[in-house]
């Protein structure tokens, strides 16, 4: 059937090492017994991290059921609906979020579950001051200070996330601010600096702060979104003429440090890296560049597959 076909495809990806959520938990918090002999369905489910609608547990029967029966690897919380920003999604206030995340974890039935969020600081913050949460500076603001100050800021953020029941933060951004007017990065203050070494230092410090609070960090958007003239939320983003090897420098540096980190691929097309597919769908970029040349052997996670750079161009 369709689900089994999807499971078999995921097993192939599992063996390729593109996204090993179970392996991550085995290394950092699961224990060998929990993953002694996962079924095909369990492996498939653990490869998926999904969004859902609802704020209170009683509104979330569908996702709670999928966590139980499909063994989902994770969920992600949003403030607003991605397709209609006027509609609320998962976050109202701290007490409500704690009830929701407790129910999500309770449904995992012994399987590890990531509860994720995008909390970079600045304009990219799902937990916002208007809902009673602390305000945090953007990467651009942090980049004007010291890496130690960045680590302390991320530690405070991580402690807040942990208290809310979140254990995975899709931050920090390792994109170099090559093009300050880049609509998805530079214009929003999401890059630490135009200097790759400064990006590496602040990115590593941010990840250290999150890790010290018990939060897994995610470096993004590989291989580099900072030179892009377009926004991958809205369509194909071709960096063939603007990207350079210097944008890999933060990854080379930050990935060499110990810690609980993942790498997120961007929906970025570069004809010289892969003439057919964007990074998210590219064995050449993931297995060849990231795992081969850079030697990364950890978890790789995609950017949102509902973004138009993927959803408008590819079918399942």
Give residue spans per PLM region.
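Hydrophobic faces of well-ordered beta-strands that scaffold small-molecule active sites
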Residues: 46-52, 73-77, 115-117, 169-171, ...
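Glycine-rich, aromatic-flanked loop segments that form ligand/cofactor-binding clefts
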Residues: 105-134, 154-177, 199-223
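Glycine-rich anion/phosphate-binding loops
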Residues: 93-97, 144-156, 200
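N-terminal hydrophobic targeting/anchoring segments and the immediately downstream early-domain regions
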Residues: 34-131
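Second-shell residues forming the walls of enzyme active-site clefts
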Residues: 58-62, 87-109, 198-316
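N-terminal secretory signal peptides that target proteins for export/translocation
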Residues: 1-13
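Bacterial N-terminal signal peptides
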Residues: 16-29
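A charged helix-plus-loop insertion that forms the helical arch/lid used to bind
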Residues: 132-145, 189-193
